[in-house]
Structures are given as C-alpha cells and as structure tokens.
Amino acid sequence: SGNQVDFGDIYTEGITKITTEDFQYAKKMKRAIKLLAISKKVGDTYCAMVSPALIPREHPLYVVNDVFNAVFVKGNMLGNSMFYGSGAGKLPTASAVAGDMVDAARHLGKIITLFWEPQKLVLAPRDEMAKRFFVRMKDNANPEALFGDGERIDAGIAGEIGFVTPVMTEAEYQKKAEGAEIISMIRIEG
C-alpha cells in the first residue's frame, strides 16, 4: 500500500541552469550530471525532490542515456536494484499511451483498486535532506571559509574554481551560501 503525494509538494528544479562548464567539472570529477527524482526517508516521513545531481561512474545510473530511463531502489532486504528501459522519445511514449488506452478499454465501467491509503503523505521539507554540494565560484573566493573543509576542483576554467562541500543539509547549505557569489550549484549523490 502507499499514500497519496501531491506533485506540487515536491521541489522541482530543471536542467536549464546547467552549463558547458558544469559538464567540464563533472568530467574532471569522473561524474555525470543526471536529472534525478529522489525520495529518502527522513525521520517518520519522506523527503522528495527532482533536480540535477552529480553521480559517480560506479553508480548504475551513470550509464543511463538517450531515450532510456531507470529507477534505482535501495531496500533493506532487496539491497540495490535498478529497473531500466525506454522511457522517452516518440515511440516509447506512443507505446505507453497506447497501452493505457488498451487497459482503459479492457476495464471500461470497472473500478480498479490500487491499495492507496486515503490519507495524504505529508513530506518532510527538502531542507532536511543531507548531502554534499558542488559549487562554482570566482577564483578569488574562499569556499572553505563559507562551507568548511571540502575539496577544491580545478577544471582549467579561467577565473573560477569548483568546490565540493562536506555533507550538510539543504538548509545549512542555503544559510552558508546566502550572499556568496556562487556561479552555480549542483547536488551530489553517491
């Protein structure tokens, strides 16, 4: 069974702010930038968000490209598991729509029980999710003074540096980054 989640309650950030320079840093870090939908247990509830993230080469999602999508699940008994297949593009989308139409026609006039709990799941604020952050700043910046011990990344881009923060919550990151001249930020998973 599950609970209803209103999609409007999920923080979403697209890929429009990702630049060529971000990809240069990702390559230097041996990571890929992927648009991820993430749900994590936080206390007694869950936190969910959609945003670009840097993932390492060792992560199974690293190889998901083109019209393919994947769902990566980590369970206490299952361990790590990934479901992978076509999910974007003209033909996969047409196939999914046609499949939905066939299912609707087969079950015309019937009520299909989905085992969802009637109460809405209240999501934890994204501020409570903890992770590392990759930030790009001007080369005269002092990211250690803002974020603490981390790792400087030099991708050979004139006038700027990259920096990987230590693990912190979204709220801690926002507070530390407030007023700083940050060129861009990408969350790090894995």
Residue ranges and their predicted role:
Residues S1-V63, F68-A70, G89:
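Substrate-binding/catalytic subdomain of NAD(P)-dependent oxidoreductase enzymes
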Residues G2-V5, Y11-K17, V97, I153, ...:
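Short, exposed beta-strand "edge-strand" segments with a Pro/Gly-rich flavor and a Y/T-containing core
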Residues K17, K27-K30, K34, K40-K41, ...:
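Context-gated lysine
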Residues I18-R31, N80-A88, P92, G150-A158:
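Short secondary-structure transition/capping segments
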Residues I38-K41, A53-E58, N76-L78, K138-N142, ...:
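Generic structural motif
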Residues Y46-R136:
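Catalytic, metal-anchored helix/loop core of enzyme active sites in primary metabolism
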Residues M101-G190:
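A conserved regulatory-domain signal marking ACT and ACT-like small-molecule sensing domains
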